[in-house]
């Protein structure tokens, strides 16, 4: 059993070394290897998953035209991403969904701005009222002390004591 393991390990090492030596001498393949590997991976995945994806898409979409349109748009988007483009092709259905989502976000932002504006206006009004209360005017006389003094004297006064003094002489 150990001999079989060592044979497999040496075989893997030899294949690895042969592959690396081939790539070392071929500069073009080495330079574009990540790009070629990604293309081969996408092609292999599309080949393996093509039929099942087509069947599922046809049952969901309902018509063959929509399926073909979705597949073509997806392929173009994959190709554009491979070449480094940030833009993507969007179908009409997705475009309508994106537009409605954007409009909903704009409406939410407008509501938030209105609430914040209302709060700010209330705060400004409150600050103006506080300023008016704190502002001292010389022509106005503050009667609160006198009023409070009168009320204090009434409260301290004994209700059972006669209001005027009567002399007994």
Swiss-Prot record:
The chain crosses the membrane at residues 29-51. Gene3D superfamilies: 1.20.5.430. Coiled coil: none annotated. Belongs to the rotavirus NSP4 family. Keywords: Activation of host autophagy by virus, Calcium, Enterotoxin, Glycoprotein, Host endoplasmic reticulum, Host membrane, Host-virus interaction, Ion channel, Ion transport, Membrane, Metal-binding, Secreted, Signal-anchor, Toxin, Transmembrane, Transmembrane helix, Transport, Viral ion channel, Virulence. Homotetramer. Interacts with the immature particle in the viroplasm. Interacts with host CAV1, early and late in infection. Interacts with host integrin ITGA1/ITGB1 heterodimer. Interacts with host integrin ITGA2/ITGB1 heterodimer. Interaction with microtubules blocks trafficking to the Golgi apparatus. One of its GO terms (cellular component) is membrane. The keyword Ion transport applies. It is a single-pass type III membrane protein. Binds 1 calcium ion per tetramer. Ca(2+) binds at residues 120, 123. Its main location: host cell. Glycans are attached at residue 8. GO terms for biological process: monoatomic ion transmembrane transport; symbiont-mediated activation of host autophagy; viral process. Plays an essential role in the virus replication cycle by acting as a viroporin. Creates a pore in the host endoplasmic reticulum and as a consequence releases Ca(2+) in the cytoplasm of infected cell. In turn, high levels of cytoplasmic calcium trigger membrane trafficking and transport of viral ER-associated proteins to viroplasms, sites of viral genome replication and immature particle assembly. The secreted form acts as an enterotoxin that causes phospholipase C-dependent elevation of the intracellular calcium concentration in host intestinal mucosa cells. Increased concentration of intracellular calcium disrupts the cytoskeleton and the tight junctions, raising the paracellular permeability. Potentiates chloride ion secretion through a calcium ion-dependent signaling pathway, inducing age-dependent diarrhea. Residues 1-28 are lumenal. It is found in: Host rough endoplasmic reticulum membrane; Host membrane, Host caveola; Secreted. Pfam families: Rota_NSP4 (PF01452). Residues 52-169 are cytoplasmic. The N-glycosyl content is primarily Man(9)GlcNAc, with a small amount of Man(8)GlcNAc. One of its GO terms (molecular function) is toxin activity. HAMAP family: ROTA_NSP4 (MF_04091). This is Non-structural glycoprotein 4.
